[in-house]
């Protein structure tokens, strides 16, 4: 068995981590030890925030739908209840898109919900 020196693989590993840490402030982008910790932490934040992103967007859609619904004299919760009773299966993303970009279609959806509640 020949002796294996670690220089090449260690250098490659260090380069990989430092490349990932490019753009970080101070030692985080220059010192391998610190950069490695920063990259690991960044990965944790990225993983967590991919989950949080879904919650954030859902709440944004709800805010938009509520604002648009109140212009038609109905609250968000009443609108959703009316849509469920009417059997309209539009998700919140689609409703928010209608509320922002297609106000006439949203008005028609609101009228359907109001009719189901009455």
Curated annotation (Swiss-Prot):
A single GO cellular-component term on record: ribosome
InterPro entries attached to this UniProt entry: Ribosomal_bL20, RIBOSOMAL_L20_CS, Ribosomal_protein_bL20_C
GO molecular function, a single term: rRNA binding
UniProt cross-references to CDD domains, sorted A to Z: Ribosomal_L20
Keyword rRNA-binding in annotation: yes
GO biological process annotation, one example: ribosomal large subunit assembly
Keywords recorded for this protein, A-Z: Ribonucleoprotein, Ribosomal protein, RNA-binding, rRNA-binding
Protein function: Binds directly to 23S ribosomal RNA and is necessary for the in vitro assembly process of the 50S ribosomal subunit. It is not involved in the protein synthesizing functions of that subunit.
UniProt similarity note: Belongs to the bacterial ribosomal protein bL20 family.
Protein name: Large ribosomal subunit protein bL20
Organism per entry: Francisella philomiragia subsp. philomiragia (strain ATCC 25017 / CCUG 19701 / FSC 153 / O#319-036)
């Amino acid at each position: 068995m020949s002796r294996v020196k670690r220089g090449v693989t260690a250098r490659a590993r260090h380069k990989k981590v430092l490349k990932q840490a490019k753009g970080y402030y101070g030692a985080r982008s220059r010192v391998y030890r610190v950069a490695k910790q920063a990259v690991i932490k960044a990965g944790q934040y990225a993983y967590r925030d991919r989950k949080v992103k879904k919650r954030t967007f859902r709440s944004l859609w709800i805010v938009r739908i509520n604002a648009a619904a109140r212009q038609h004299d109905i609250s968000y919760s009443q609108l959703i209840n009316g849509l469920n009773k009417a059997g309209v299966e539009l998700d919140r993303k689609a409703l928010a898109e209608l509320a922002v970009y297609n106000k006439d279609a949203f008005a028609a959806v609101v009228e359907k919900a109001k009719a189901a509640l009455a």
